[in-house]
């Protein structure tokens, strides 16, 4: 660590949307954002779980618009920057401008790990707006460290000043993480930051985040009580406790985060965010974590096991954006019974 301060990026109000089907109220957003700000996290990501304009039949309709959620959070924060997520093809540069006007100052432009080339316009426009612009390579387990580094280099070339390794399936272990950060560090400019976005499907969210920091990672994504898709993200309060034990500087208030996790976030979970049969299957099969709730719905509708659907999706190497294939797979499994 060499005494540097970690950048703590909270994702409770974006990835956490998946855990409750994108149904945060504006009051929920204000209370959680204020608690995070009081605990001195560096940024608070706010959007539909699938990013700006993710509210749709395919991904699930949100209780509010992205702009309403962003404005609600921006109204109560004094220290943290408001961040948002944009997936090219779902959100547009017009949506990004509106998010900026609503108060977002950080954007993570997210693509599948082999499709960085679709992010060029969005990254360039974000830089023109003056936003802190981050490249976000989802499902990073699905390509080699060397290929991932080449994709990261593309995003850097478009103007991203930080590139994330994103374990969307919660499928990687510490060696996988180390290999990817070493590859990125060898390819990127020294001044380009790196970030880690973990999921906890194999219970390795915190361990993988620690491994990333040990390899020089600058920014860590985490969420209160792990609130996120699948078994959730690296639980923020747990990561901070572990970072304290390691003597790392993070600038946040551990006990305030612990209180926010248990008092504000955990009570909102209509399905526990934890490692269980279904979420473990996500990590084991390497499936996009936000498929969980969609798979459980399809399993109930067609009289199937959600695990069977998840395993088949993994075999077919489905990726984020292919949520419509969940029903196809379910029908295939039912017909083959």
UniProtKB/Swiss-Prot annotation:
Catalytically driven reaction(s): (S)-4-hydroxy-2-oxopentanoate = acetaldehyde + pyruvate
Coiled coil: none
Covalent S-S links between cysteines: none
Residues flagged as site, Transition state stabilizer: 14
Enzyme Commission number(s) of this protein: 4.1.3.39
Active site: 18
Domain Pyruvate carboxyltransferase: 6-258
Positions of Mn(2+) binding: 15, 197, 199
Protein residues bound to substrate: 14-15, 168, 197, 288
Keywords, in A-Z order: Aromatic hydrocarbons catabolism, Lyase, Manganese, Metal-binding
Annotated GO MF terms: 2-isopropylmalate synthase activity; 4-hydroxy-2-oxovalerate aldolase activity; manganese ion binding
Pathway: Aromatic compound metabolism; 3-phenylpropanoate degradation
InterPro entries noted in UniProt: 2-IPM_HCS-like (IPR050073), 4OH_2_O-val_aldolase (IPR017629), Aldolase_TIM (IPR013785), DmpG_comm (IPR012425), DRE_TIM_HOA (IPR035685), PYR_CT (IPR000891)
Pfam family, one: HMGL-like
GO biological process: 3-phenylpropionate catabolic process; L-leucine biosynthetic process
Assembly and oligomerization: Interacts with MhpF.
Chain's role: Catalyzes the retro-aldol cleavage of 4-hydroxy-2-oxopentanoate to pyruvate and acetaldehyde. Is involved in the meta-cleavage pathway for the degradation of aromatic compounds.
Matches recorded under NCBIfam families: 4OH_2_O_val_ald, PRK08195.1
Name of the molecule in the record: 4-hydroxy-2-oxovalerate aldolase
Source organism: Escherichia coli O9:H4 (strain HS)
Gene: mhpE
